[in-house]
Amino acid sequence: MRFGRGDFKNLEQAEERCFLLTNGLGGYCSLTLAGGNARKDHALFMGVEKAPNCRYHYLTNLQESLETEKEVFDLSTQRYVNWTKNQHGYRYLQMVSPEDIPEWVFEARGITVRREIVMVHEENTVGIRYRITAPEGTKAVLKVCPLLRCSKKDEEPKESQSYLLGEKTLESDGKRLYYETDGTVVPLKEERISDLYFAYDSRDGREAVGMVVKNHEIRFAVSGGTREYSLIYSDRPVEKTVRELMEAERLRLLKLTETAGFQDPAAVRLVKSADQFLVKRESTGGDSIMAGYPFFSDWGRDTMIAVLGCGIETRQFERVKSILRTFAFYCEKGLMPNLFPEGESEPLYNTVDASLWFVEAVYEYGKASGDLDFVKEMLPNLESVVNWYRKGTDFHIFMDEDGLISAGAGLEQVTWMDVRYEDILPTSRHGKPVEVNALWYNALCILAELSENGHEYETLAETVKQSFLE
């Protein structure tokens, strides 16, 4: 998949699409295809303190400019509160390829700048490679200025926060960020830029203004011909080259697609995309699935639905088992977590359907993998879900006399239509939602097949069927 000059005719068009790289821990690298920040949660380097939902915003972006002996070309794309400061680097974009190792090609006055970005799997590390090609006799310098943030994902940097640049390190907010580059590092007078404007946040009613800090730049020079340079940031000392990091990621993606076994190019792309949402969960030492980037963490409903495509169809069976064990570990009174909030907060359980999707996920895993031992391991959890729903659990979730499941009361949001504005639920859906009872019937049919008490569940399933049809 490639995008060309015709896809970046103006700033609005340059912000329409984004790319996403993830590290399997909840961290990510995500900007617009033109390389800008259209949301405050966009970041060149969003790391993780505790996987997957204690995230840390290290670097917002890299400001890039190409300087010749006569001209300066600003390659960055970004909006500001004062629109006269807007950067229009998309005008120099010739090509963007966002797949696998994303690549950008800029061209100005016959000088070509190629940029590639990689995020290392299960590490807080991001690597950038530049290839600069200039005509014979032409001297040019690519200046790259990191836009520093160094704060928790949903917090602004402190006013008093310092940014200490050392040899191969940057220290701020009690953290040390390591960097490795073959360019020339030039310290700058610290500058706080507090008027970045995020157009898509503004449309959503979110806080649309943000700040970053500049205190150094890296210079990459070329004098005719082609030069290759690299820049790596990590929360640990850098031991590998960008070339090695990229080769390792390509090999990982190749093994992933070989395991899935698909030949169709679209299916192969989907396998790679699905993998971006699989993450480690430190609290259990297992796996989970992110509901979406850049906003969401791992949600129960989303995970149980997504595991069918992100794990089972792609034949990531060990990870599927780990995901199901993770949510079984957190099950309370028959309820799977609705979501794990950003940070250290306890999980929330206001969902009626996540547990029923869990039953379906275990069943589908068993059919696809043939791993009946794991299904037997999970069977007590499946029966616990159904039994709690029968006798009643939290959030007014209970089986009514007709066998159907009723859920929710007051301000409780228990289905996927969970919008709440102050004390108003525009779509409360309290009572007996149709999809919930379809899932309930499905869960009973599954237990009728798997449980030693199958006849009991079969009888109840028939009652539910009749009540549903009536």
Role assignments for model-derived ranges:
Residues 88-99, 183-197, 258-279, 317-328, ...:
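An acidic intrinsically disordered interaction segment
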Residues 143-148, 158-160, 323-325, 341-342, ...:
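"Short basic amphipathic alpha-helical interaction patches in structured regions
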